[in-house]
């Protein structure tokens, strides 16, 4: 949610355990003082990084990472404002875990969780897009009445549990952590201000976990099974031109393995070329596996020929192709009116962003069972699920959800 304190919380984690060097931090602190922001805000870290990223400066990706005892955590920022939901859709589809930050302040929590609040929408999106692990940070515990109130935390935990359960999450498997991203309570170490908090604990079929702070909850994430045995699919997030090296597409391996020497094809443009090298965390890799965010250098292809939303695959093993049309199950989350044949919204699938026409609404189905409830409905509205034939304005690389989940889920808005 916009003011739940996501940036401050994230900034705090990057600041304390991340890839930001001392010099940069001192520079930020000095600027903050000069601007009369007496106290240095962690959110600033994120604002500075975002500003640089928006100016087209290739940010050293290390800045968007921090380390726990067990993992490298890469932050896929999903700011809370309405127009950012699209980023969230393309970004969330790459997340292994979502951290939902809710503000505990009087009135703040209620606003976020209200009928059209964003907390609700974000949690629903994360689940719909296949992010099955969730952590809830109950933030701004310092601004409850009285500060660090146990009853306020319990009230919020109860309320959030009930609605994430409706969405499909199992609350018993979700860590609820009372925090202050600003003061640092329960972020990296147990807070002395909440002696009543005995810790979070989760139960799931893979076993139990418990801890006191947010970083431990991140440490307790289960690493998802990585589909290395499937054909290669790597949606491009960006394409850089790097002096002395050449064209470097960047993206996350979703399925399969990418290694130097692979002859890749980029769909839907059908451009074929050889991979010269693969790099992650500034180190050359002999192979990249699902979950790896990598840059790879390709021969004889200019930056202009490739774009975000293209998908790289192995030309010799079930390569990806563009689709001129496709059939999908669509769930209408919150759309103001009726949707009928001919409706042409913008669709976001993996990293692609493209106008698509609802050519034919074939049937309405039950959201939970998928059974048909009505053939050829005139229109569909909020809450409905339907099977629809979609026609993208130009070829789009999509796959069946069964075979390649990250390329089989999308959002239209």
UniProtKB/Swiss-Prot annotation:
The modification 5-glutamyl glycerylphosphorylethanolamine is found at residues 287, 360. It is found in: Cytoplasm. Keywords: Cytoplasm, Elongation factor, GTP-binding, Nucleotide-binding, Phosphoprotein, Protein biosynthesis. CDD domains: EF1_alpha, EF1_alpha_II, EF1_alpha_III. The keyword Zinc-finger does not apply. Its main location: cytoplasm. GO terms for molecular function: GTP binding; GTPase activity; translation elongation factor activity. GO terms for cellular component: cytoplasm. PROSITE patterns: G_TR_1, G_TR_2. Residues 1-228 form the tr-type G domain. GTP binds at residues 1-7, 77-82, 139-142. Gene3D superfamilies: P-loop containing nucleotide triphosphate hydrolases, Translation factors. Belongs to the TRAFAC class translation factor GTPase superfamily. Classic translation factor GTPase family. EF-Tu/EF-1A subfamily. This protein promotes the GTP-dependent binding of aminoacyl-tRNA to the A-site of ribosomes during protein biosynthesis. This is Elongation factor 1-alpha.
């Amino acid at each position: 949610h916009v003011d739940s304190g996501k940036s401050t919380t994230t900034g705090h984690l990057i600041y304390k355990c991340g890839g930001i060097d001392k010099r940069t931090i001192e520079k930020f602190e000095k600027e903050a003082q000069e601007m009369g922001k007496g106290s240095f805000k962690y959110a600033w870290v994120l604002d500075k990084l975002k500003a640089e990223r928006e100016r087209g400066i290739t940010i050293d990706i290390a800045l968007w990472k921090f380390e726990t005892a067990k993992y490298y955590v890469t932050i896929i920022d999903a700011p809370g404002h309405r127009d950012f939901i699209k980023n969230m859709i393309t970004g969330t589809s790459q997340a292994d875990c979502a951290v939902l930050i809710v503000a505990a302040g009087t009135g703040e929590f209620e606003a976020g969780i209200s009928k059209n609040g964003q907390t609700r929408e974000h949690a629903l999106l994360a689940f719909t897009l296949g992010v099955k692990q969730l952590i809830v940070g109950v933030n701004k515990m310092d601004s409850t009445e009285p500060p660090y109130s146990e009853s306020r935390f319990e009230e919020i935990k109860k309320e959030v549990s009930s609605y994430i359960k409706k969405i499909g999450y199992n609350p018993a498997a979700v860590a609820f952590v009372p925090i202050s991203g600003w003061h640092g309570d329960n972020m990296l170490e147990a807070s002395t201000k909440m002696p009543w908090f005995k810790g979070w604990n989760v139960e799931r079929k893979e076993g139990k976990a418990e801890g006191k702070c947010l970083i431990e909850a991140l440490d307790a994430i289960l690493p998802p099974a990585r589909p290395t045995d499937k054909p290669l699919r790597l949606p491009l997030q960006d394409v850089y031109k790097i002096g002395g090296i050449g064209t470097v597409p960047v993206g996350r391996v979703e399925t399969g393995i990418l290694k130097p020497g692979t002859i890749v094809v980029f769909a839907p443009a059908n451009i074929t070329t050889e991979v010269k090298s693969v790099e992650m965390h500034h180190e050359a890799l002999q192979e990249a596996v699902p979950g790896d965010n990598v840059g790879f250098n390709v021969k004889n292809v200019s930056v202009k020929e490739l774009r975000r939303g293209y998908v790289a695959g192995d030309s010799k093993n079930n390569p990806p192709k563009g689709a001129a049309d496709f059939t999908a199950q669509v769930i209408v989350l919150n759309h103001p009116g009726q949707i009928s044949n001919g409706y042409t919204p913008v669709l976001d699938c993996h990293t692609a962003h493209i106008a698509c026409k609802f050519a034919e609404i074939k049937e309405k189905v039950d959201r939970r069972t998928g059974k048909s409830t009505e053939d050829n409905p005139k229109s569909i509205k909020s809450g409905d699920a339907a099977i629809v034939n979609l026609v993208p304005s130009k070829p789009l690389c999509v796959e069946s959800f069964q075979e390649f989940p990250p390329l089989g889920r999308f959002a239209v808005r």
